[in-house]
């Protein structure tokens, strides 16, 4: 109980708005670390690391790993700036992240390696529709949306 209270007080003491800039380490297709800050990319949901999907030819692949690799390629050692003002129940900063002027969250969805997370935001629905029409990333084959896969 004391641990939870301490954690809650720590989270409440954090600034309401946080900009974090630096080199990022990719955890998965929608989570990164910059310095001591764990960041969940706002408005998108990428496959979980152990999640599989199928290619257009029916071959099973680790789509969570592919989403992580896609985010790593987008970042490629560049400085990343993340802007956010909320934290999730795990204490992660919820943020839109940029390489220069480019929205990484949008790029992940536009390339088809993440979905618009409509439960929390409608910001990336157009990007998702474009990826779907162009059959990019996950849209080349068959997959279960990450939020459904987690509930199995």
Task: Enumerate the language-model features and the residues they cover.
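Small beta-barrel nucleic-acid-binding modules, primarily SNase/OB-fold domains
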Residues: 2-4, 12-152
């Amino acid at each position: 109980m004391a641990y939870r209270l301490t954690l809650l007080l720590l989270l409440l003491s954090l600034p309401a708005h946080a900009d974090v800039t630096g080199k990022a380490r990719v955890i998965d297709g929608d989570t990164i670390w910059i310095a001591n800050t764990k960041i969940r990319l706002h408005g998108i949901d990428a496959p979980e690391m152990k999640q599989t999907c199928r290619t257009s030819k029916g071959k099973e692949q680790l789509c969570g790993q592919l989403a992580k690799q896609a985010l790593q390629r987008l970042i490629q050692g560049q400085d990343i700036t993340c802007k956010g003002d909320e934290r999730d129940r795990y204490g992660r900063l919820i943020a839109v992240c940029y390489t220069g002027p480019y929205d990484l969250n949008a790029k992940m969805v536009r390339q088809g390696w993440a979905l618009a997370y409509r439960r929390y935001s409608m910001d990336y629905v157009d990007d998702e529709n474009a990826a779907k029409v162009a059959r990019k990333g996950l849209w080349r084959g068959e997959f279960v949306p990450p939020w459904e896969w987690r509930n199995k």
